[in-house]
Amino acid sequence: MKKIALFLMLVPCFYLSQMKTGTFSEMEALQKESPKPVVIHLYTDWCAVCKIESYHLNKDKELVNLMNDHFYFVNFEAEKTKEKIHFQHQEFEYLQNGNSGIHELALALSKNKNQSVYPLWVFLDKHQNLVYYQEGQMTPEKMKEKLLEISAL
């Protein structure tokens, strides 16, 4: 019984140190009230590197605080998100391809228009201009470096 109680008390602690995520529509509404730079993370549920990366990034409390305090963060599942998304005055839809598919926005954000690479990171300034783009895994150290560079703009 004591182990269960301890477990129930510790579980919320793990969730307290996670990056706050939102949707594209939430981010655009918040941008109108309080402009901040934006970090967009494109991933898929089958991407093992994405899961490992997410674990390591959320484990770094300094990074989590920096992200939550100074940026809007959109965690975008490129192959499962099926709703229409309005972003930068354009509308994007899910492109069905048999039993799977990909969202048009994932292709629009990717420099490789035929097939996105995951994980994919897109950093925008508070005016939604591209300031950094990275395909592949992002380490906590590299993420902090980029966030500090962008927040200084």
Question: What do these predicted ranges mean?
Answer:
Residues K20-P37, A106:
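A short beta-strand-turn-helix
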Residues L63, N68-L120, L124-L130:
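Thioredoxin-like thiol-disulfide oxidoreductase module
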Residues M1-K20:
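Bacterial Sec-dependent N-terminal signal peptides
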Residues D45-I52, L120-V122:
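C-type cytochrome heme c attachment motif
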Residues F123-L153:
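Thiol-/selenol-based redox modules, centered on thioredoxin-like
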Residues S34-A48:
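Short active-site neighborhood of thiol/selenol oxidoreductases, capturing the structured segment around
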Residues K51-N68:
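Typically the conserved alpha-helix immediately C-terminal to a functionally engaged Cys/Sec
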Residues L42-T44, G101-I102, L107, Q134-M143:
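Short beta-strand and adjacent turn/loop elements
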